[in-house]
Amino acid sequence: MPVARPEASDARVIAHVDMDCFYVQVEQRKQPELRGLPSAVVQYNEWQGGGLIAVSYEARKCGVKRSMRGDEAKAACPQIQLVQVPVARGKADLNLYRSAGSEVVSILAKSGKCERASIDEVYLDLTDAAESMLADAPPESLELIDEEVLKSHILGMNREDGDDFKESVRNWICREDADRRDKLLSCGIIIVAELRKQVLKETEFTCSAGIAHNKMLAKLASGMNKPAQQTVVPYAAVQELLSSLPIKKMKQLGGKLGTSLQTDLGVDTVGDLLQFSETKLQEHYGVNTGTWLWNIARGISGEEVQGRLLPKSHGSGKTFPGPRALKSLSTVQHWLNQLSEELSERLGSDLEQNKRIASTLTLHASAFRSKDSDSHKKFPSKSCPMRYGVTKIQEDAFNLFQAALREYMGSFGIKPQGNKLETWRITGLSVSASKIVDIPSGTSSIMRYFQSQPTVPSRSADGCVQGNVAMTASASEGCSEQRSTETQAAMPEVDTGVTYTLPNFENQDKDIDLVSEKDVVSCPSNEATDVSTQSESNKGTQTKKIGRKMNNSKEKNRGMPSIVDIFKNYNATPPSKQETQEDSTVSSASKRAKLSSSSHNSQVNQEVEESRETDWGYKTDEIDQSVFDELPVEIQRELRSFLRTNKQFNTGKSKGDGSTSSIAHYFPPLNR
């Protein structure tokens, strides 16, 4: 939903820099022989030659359009050179283009606040740079103006008959009677032209730009004169730009809102909105949206340049059109594994290079039912807390898909059964990681994010579970079907400052394009138990004991820890009888000392504190597996998997002293 923001009172200078057919330029730099030839970059897709994602200007002159497929492009322009996007994991690999885009951003960011909007476009706030230039070297004082500056297109610029275009631009820029707004724009024209020249020199890429007083107008202007040119929108020319602009061309009006304006109010251009009062628009679309519509009709936008060089999210997706649509859960899982692997690599790179970690994993998909024209309902998106590591992301992505599938098919009154999707087809899959935050300073090693460290999630003041939470999605049963609190990115000594909540899949926003705050909600669960570990050495053999104590704090932990967390980080070898007797003797002696003497407070208090925990050990062979049947299915699977692992690990490592310690008391008795 659009958000109405008041425009800054002071004049701003905002530029939108857009690379010219960027993918083609990247390939031309790699293969210089393609320069000057009609060429295009095609997606990885064998069907009809693949879809075009970038078309050179030479190919456009031959009638080739980006909406075409490779075979169509060759029919329209037989001499066209088609270059396929690099492939990895059976899908397009865009890392080459991302890296090239980063080269451009590193150059543009030197001029002021910079916001990377996509692989090939950037917003710049040049207000400070323009004000400095206006104070030190105003345009009217310049004797020489660069040729690139004089090529600028200035909307609303008056030209006398017979005047040279470049001379008219010079006169507009150097006006002494211009108001402050226009003088700042003149400085912006000079700054942007120099930046574009620098980008061309260092990267061999051309770019176009729009220069205006806000992001909205700059974005509209950047595409008006391509390639390798820049367009300026002075304040006086705003209405000229917007009066004839189709309503669907305006950002955020290309969907349902724009359609509603056309059908309900008869609005075809942005200028048509001027006939409606702010109150009238608010009556139709609410206070916030109504005010936003009233503002954009007048070229008003207070949206700030965010000063962000790094992406807000990472994603990986693939479409399966026509006969390539997925027909079984196994093929869906295969492709989710591929997408998750790519996403994991990008997250790991971001973590290593930028010290950032993502908080939320989201799955999007599209589906339809063959021979059913009424089946094109939106496939619900699902989100859960982010866990790092390829296997974990793959597992969570598939669980999210299954939850979404149950909800989607449930809307038709159908329950999914078996591996086959029957008449259903999946035509698109994507996984994304969002809500990315910086890692707090003082973190000893980022590799901790890839290590499983079982910690009990704590609860913040607002009741949210803190820490990365592993979970298995359920559509109909909500969070209670399967739950785990294995923390995958825990750093005990550092608070990451990120709060996560377990998702409730029954109350999720189904907007595929956004991960909203309501996508992830808190799930009630049982009180957690704090498990502490002690270790000591005896007769050259290191053993570990498990201490179990209740937390007396007023703030109780939430979340149901996996039962395997209690066992998996401890040595399964029980303490010897001698050790147990020695511990018991020390415990009793320390208690008696506490009651009989106060002269040794320091030593005795320490011993009493140690004796408050009841020590116990266990031996995996003594666990009665018949009691497993009384446990939830999820815990049964975890325990059996754990015991198999420990049995292999401990083979041949018995002490041979016959000492045993039972854990049977941990389980309720089995009624036979």
From Swiss-Prot:
Tissue: Constitutively expressed in roots, stems, leaves, flowers and siliques.
Keywords: DNA damage, DNA repair, DNA replication, DNA synthesis, DNA-binding, DNA-directed DNA polymerase, Magnesium, Manganese, Metal-binding, Mutator protein, Nucleotidyltransferase, Nucleus, Schiff base, Transferase
Gene3D superfamilies: 3.30.70.270, 3.40.1170.60, 5' to 3' exonuclease, C-terminal subdomain, 6.10.250.1630, DNA polymerase, Y-family, little finger domain
Cofactor descriptive note: Binds 2 Mg(2+). Prefers Mg(2+), but can also use Mn(2+). In vitro, can also utilize other divalent cations such as Ca(2+).
Main location: nucleus
Residues reported in the UniProt entry to bind a 2'-deoxyribonucleoside 5'-triphosphate: Y23, R60
GO cellular component, one term: nucleus
Localization (cell): Nucleus
Active-site positions on this chain: E121 (proton acceptor)
Temperature dependence: Optimum temperature is 22 degrees Celsius.
Pfam families named among the record's database cross-references: IMS, IMS_C, POLH-Rev1_HhH
Record comment: activity regulation: The enzyme in complex with the DNA substrate binds a third divalent metal cation. The binding of this third divalent cation, which is coordinated by water molecules and two oxygen atoms from DNA and dNTP, is essential for catalyzing the DNA synthesis.
Binding site residues for Mg(2+) 2: D18, D120, E121
Enzyme nomenclature, EC number: 2.7.7.7
Entry keyword annotation includes Protein biosynthesis: no
The protein's assembly and partners: Interacts with PCNA1 and PCNA2. The interaction with PCNA2 is required for translesion synthesis (TLS) to repair UV photoproducts.
UniProt note: domains: The catalytic core consists of fingers, palm and thumb subdomains, but the fingers and thumb subdomains are much smaller than in high-fidelity polymerases; residues from five sequence motifs of the Y-family cluster around an active site cleft that can accommodate DNA and nucleotide substrates with relaxed geometric constraints, with consequently higher rates of misincorporation and low processivity.
Protein name: DNA polymerase eta
Organism of origin: Arabidopsis thaliana
This protein's encoding gene: POLH
